[in-house]
């Protein structure tokens, strides 16, 4: 039996390791819902969320007007984006199809959650009419918007969802005014007659069709063409962009449609950074949406930092009062590293019934050897432990429990030290995919094999700054270093800035072990020789 044969699901399947907020096609949605692992930690977060949100679906929602914010935090790769994306499917009760079968999002959770009362709360929430708008704020913002960026993105995604012009808010405002007067359909009909094209198709090029717009407005409203032309010419100047107006427009839409609305904003913490004015805008938008919309409009954001850490530096530096935003985002969900390891085990590393006794036999024969082989030296600051039981060995093999902690630190350090390109810096690479890539590399090998740490380098290589990856590639190909030397160089690069693990000789030996029965004395000699080159 080789490593490829021990897993319940194929190692080479598409697991959507890269979660993109706006990739919501049926095929992706089905896989994400079907394979989503509700760990103990995630079930706790879901309970906390629905305890907060369910009252907003009933007559007591007005009492929620000051508590309509949810702040989801966690380190890079912890699953924040995946969590709110799954929430978006669930709260909109998204219908997905796969091979002729149709299911609603809620049905996937009936198999994942055993608590009937908790399921009843979820069921109540998902069957309340709700409009969910999920977006990555950085991908939707214009670089020139600066302090108004957050408000403009909120307005942009709202206009887009309700059918108005997304890219030009003053055009959307014209559409909204015509709709209020009951003249929007007449305007679109007149425009189509005049131009032989639809308004929705042409409105982003309104600069080139101002005469046609004026004529269509005249026919729809009954005013003169000259008055209509003046209206068109003044649209941009007269557009009232402020937070209060935005919230009023949301309220009017909610009143008309009898729904709740959720703005789910991915990576808001990274987008705001240390910009005090942006944080104040987010605070005001959340506060006004809560009050004006009476608990029917919610804001759910993700951030690598928890809310106290995100605003702490700003308050001390600029003397601003962010106490309101702390109150508005009263529901705070922090994803941890334990959640990541459990997700990887359940999505990637579940073993077949035939593999479990085979691995149990390996542990019974080699357990003591594994404990000694995979221990780090006393300089190690974190509790980076090897396997402690047969069950843990079976659950994690061919990986070691400390792989999760160290790889998390590697991802964080590469980002913060500037070695990563834009995609990795924006959270476009997950630990799940890194573990899948490493497992695939050793899949033909037997059950005496382990994953040496350098195997994780392949998962991030293409996302490094070209100068960094080129240096490592050239060093490996210069004729002086052999394959073992090159692999050790990759290990040294990966742990260079990892503070919980020093690159001592003994630690490098432990990280380089690729067989259970590796001769550690001989491996130490090879590592030492390689370091001296």
What are these regions (language model features)?
Residues 278, 358-359, 369-484, 495-506, ...:
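C-terminal helical "lid" subdomain and adjoining coupling/linker elements of P-loop NTPases
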Residues 240-294:
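Conserved Walker B catalytic segment
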Residues 12, 91, 139-143, 269-270, ...:
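Conserved nucleotide-binding/hydrolysis micro-motifs of P-loop NTPases
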Residues 1-78, 85, 89-91, 148, ...:
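Walker A/P-loop-proximal flanking segment of P-loop NTPase domains
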Residues 1-22, 275, 281-384:
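The catalytic "switch" region of P-loop NTPases
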Residues 171-174, 294-315, 484, 500-533:
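Extended, well-ordered alpha-helical scaffold/bundle regions in very large, multi-domain proteins
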Residues 70-75, 82-207, 327, 331-345:
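P-loop NTPase motor core
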Residues 195-246:
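Long, low-complexity, polar/charged, intrinsically disordered or flexibly structured peripheral segments
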